């Protein structure tokens, strides 16, 4: 049922409940009518939608729930506006109200899809509101790994879903370009520039071992110029002793590499925010000073502590260590102050589950500033790790990174690149990248964020129903093929299909497919409200399944014009919703496979 019809029916039910309640208690009686929520029953035989309002109100109204349900139904069907929406109403069990929606109401989804096209499912209900979604936020110390890939998929799709509700969404990447890890990157590159390699005497213990460090050192010594998308070009100084120059070059080099990873993955950001700018602009010091003045800190053992227990943390936390350096959550607090000051009253951070411990500290710091930031700010979506499998074995290493599998490895392997071919990116064609990107994005969004994910390369390469992205894309391609055949054989023009006689769509499979199409708008609203982008992938698999069931049961290429065009209209609407949903995931919708 379309949201507009559902809202109308819920309003009619609420009016019916009020009528019955006043009849039982008197016109002047005061009572609270609970929100009417219609749900699709788990068993199709129980009707199209159901609600339990009679059981909720039976006790307050002093009556039997089943008898109350009967009176509510009688009041409902007596309303003229309900007669075009409801075919039948039944009472089940102790007082459930089960409603069967009219055929016309079910068929209305097809016209809605044709009318709205790519906008079908979206809403402007949150227009004028702004949301910042921060995700990936990797250290510029190496290529993006598969955990970053999961975060990129979650963040990008969630941003799309939230934008579908009318929000103005700002995508942001926070670069942790300050601290010990950046220092380790510099000494790693310096060691490579000196001709050392992992395992050699003199190789720094904390150095990074990936082959990419050798590439950075080579380009630095060759005087190459590199730049991130939002950064100034940096040219290799060729001076092995100039550690600061090496650091700047290495950071710029890896930021550029990460830009290329994100481009291959189809992810774009509106802004890159540098942690180093928080120090250079004095924001960290300013935040700490404000917390001191607010009485949220105390000194002990030469360190400055934040009273995080005041905000629910299990113990107070050190902000500034005895050596004068800050602990890692302090710049996070300063960074979130900038988000608030930029006008983002709703902020969502996508992070690995290993960041769970920082949530209370960041929120405590923000509350301690007393600048109007609400409790629970920001929101978090935490994801668990990804394990990569191939040939039944876990893949732990890659030539690129040395100690982990990179996003680019995963994209290329999932697109069909042979092991070892990833070492020569110029050998990877665009079709391979597209196939790989589609598989990786769909797979990584196909589970709830808080569950561990096993990425099976062999499954991603399968071209059958076992592969979920293939299953959904094949449904889209199959419909495109049928519509082309209808054009060739019967001169059926898709643009004319909205005029088809939809009363022909009476089979259980057709009705079920129409109901699934009508769920898409509510599905997007739910996914946005619950920060649950995986719900879109779940829905698309279900929709593809409903299509296959319908197509196997109903012949579309028939000579009889009325049923042919009606079924073709249903297929065309299904194709559009599949395309819309795949676009929400950042996955292509091929017309041929």
Swiss-Prot record:
**Subunit description:** Monomer.
Q: Which GO terms describe its molecular function?
A: arginine-tRNA ligase activity; ATP binding
The record's Gene Ontology cellular component field reads: cytoplasm
InterPro entries, per database record? aa-tRNA-synth_I_CS, Arg-tRNA-ligase, Arg-tRNA-synth_N, Arg-tRNA-synth_N_sf, ArgRS_core, DALR_anticod-bd, Rossmann-like_a/b/a_fold, tRNAsynth_Ia_anticodon-bd
Q: Which PANTHER family match?
A: ARGININE--TRNA LIGASE, CYTOPLASMIC, ARGINYL-TRNA SYNTHETASE
Q: Which organism is it from?
A: Burkholderia vietnamiensis (strain G4 / LMG 22486) (Burkholderia cepacia (strain R1808))
User: What family does the Swiss-Prot or TrEMBL record give for this protein?
Assistant: Belongs to the class-I aminoacyl-tRNA synthetase family.
Record-linked Gene3D superfamilies: Arginyl tRNA synthetase N-terminal domain, HUPs, Isoleucyl-tRNA Synthetase, Domain 1
E.C. no: 6.1.1.19
Query: Where does the record place it?
Result: Cytoplasm
Q: Name the domain of life this protein comes from.
A: Bacteria
Question: Which Pfam families does the entry link to?
Answer: Arg_tRNA_synt_N (PF03485), DALR_1 (PF05746), tRNA-synt_1d (PF00750)
Under SMART domains, the record lists:
Arg_tRNA_synt_N, DALR_1
Q: Where is this motif: 'HIGH' region?
A: 138-148
Record's protein name: Arginine--tRNA ligase
Q: Which terms under GO biological process does the entry name?
A: arginyl-tRNA aminoacylation
Q: Which UniProt keywords apply?
A: Aminoacyl-tRNA synthetase, ATP-binding, Cytoplasm, Ligase, Nucleotide-binding, Protein biosynthesis
Q: Which reaction does it catalyse?
A: tRNA(Arg) + L-arginine + ATP = L-arginyl-tRNA(Arg) + AMP + diphosphate
Name the gene that codes for it. argS
């Amino acid at each position: 049922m379309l949201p507009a019809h559902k809202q109308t029916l819920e309003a009619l039910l609420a009016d019916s409940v009020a009528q019955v309640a006043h009849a039982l208690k008197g016109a002047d009686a005061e009572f609270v009518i609970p929100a009417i929520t219609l749900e699709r029953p788990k068993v199709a035989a129980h009707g199209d939608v159901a609600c339990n309002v009679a059981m909720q109100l039976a006790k307050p109204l002093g009556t039997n729930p089943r008898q109350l349900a009967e009176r509510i139904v009688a009041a409902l069907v007596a309303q003229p506006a309900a007669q075009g929406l409801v075919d039948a109403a039944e009472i089940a069990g102790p007082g459930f109200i089960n409603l069967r929606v009219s055929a016309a109401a079910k068929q209305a989804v097809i016209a809605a899809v044709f009318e709205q096209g790519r906008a079908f499912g979206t809403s402007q209900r949150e227009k004028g509101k702004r949301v910042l979604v921060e995700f990936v936020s990797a250290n510029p110390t190496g290529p993006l790994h598969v955990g970053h890939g999961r975060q990129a998929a979650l963040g990008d799709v969630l941003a799309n879903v939230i934008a579908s509700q009318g929000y103005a969404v700002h995508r942001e990447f926070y670069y942790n370009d300050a601290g010990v890890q950046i220092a380790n990157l510099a000494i790693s590159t310096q060691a490579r520039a000196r001709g050392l390699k992992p395992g050699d005497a003199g190789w720094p213990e904390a150095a990074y071992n990936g082959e990419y460090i050798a590439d950075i050192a080579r380009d630095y010594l060759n005087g190459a110029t590199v730049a991130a998308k939002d950064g100034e070009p940096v040219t290799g100084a060729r001076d092995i002793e100039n550690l600061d120059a090496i650091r700047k070059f290495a950071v710029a080099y890896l930021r550029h590499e990460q830009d290329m990873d994100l481009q291959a993955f189809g992810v774009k950001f509106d802004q890159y925010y540098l942690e180093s700018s928080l120090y250079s602009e004095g924001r960290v010091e300013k935040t700490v000073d404000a917390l001191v003045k607010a009485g949220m800190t105390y000194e002990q053992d030469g360190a400055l502590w934040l009273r995080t227990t005041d905000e629910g943390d299990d113990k107070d936390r050190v902000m500034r260590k005895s050596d004068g350096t800050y602990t890692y959550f302090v710049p996070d607090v300063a960074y979130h102050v900038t988000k608030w000051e930029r006008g983002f009253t709703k902020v969502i951070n996508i992070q690995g589950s290993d960041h769970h411990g920082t949530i209370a500290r960041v929120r405590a710091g923000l509350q301690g500033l007393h600048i109007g930031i609400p409790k629970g700010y920001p929101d978090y979506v935490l994801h668990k790790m990804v394990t990569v499998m191939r040939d039944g074995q876990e893949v732990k290493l890659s030539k690129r990174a040395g100690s982990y599998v990179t996003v680019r490895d995963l994209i290329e392997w999932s697109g069909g690149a042979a092991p070892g071919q990833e070492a020569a990116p110029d050998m990877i064609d665009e079709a391979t990248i597209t196939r790989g990107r589609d598989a990786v994005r769909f797979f990584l969004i196909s589970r709830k964020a808080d569950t561990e994910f096993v990425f099976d390369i062999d499954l991603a390469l399968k071209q059958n129903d076992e592969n979920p992205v293939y299953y959904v894309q094949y449904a889209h391609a199959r419909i495109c093929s049928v519509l082309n055949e209808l054009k060739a054989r019967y001169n059926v023009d898709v643009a004319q299909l909205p005029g088809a006689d939809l009363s022909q769509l009476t089979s259980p499979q057709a009705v079920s497919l129409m109901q699934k199409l009508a769920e898409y708008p509510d599905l997007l609203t739910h996914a946005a409200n619950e920060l649950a982008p995986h719900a879109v992938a779940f829905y698309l698999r279900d929709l593809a399944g409903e299509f296959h069931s319908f197509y196997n049961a109903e012949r579309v290429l028939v000579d009889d014009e009325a049923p042919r065009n009606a079924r073709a209209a249903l297929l065309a609407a299904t194709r559009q919703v599949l395309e819309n949903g795949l676009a929400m995931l950042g996955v292509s919708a091929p017309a041929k496979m």
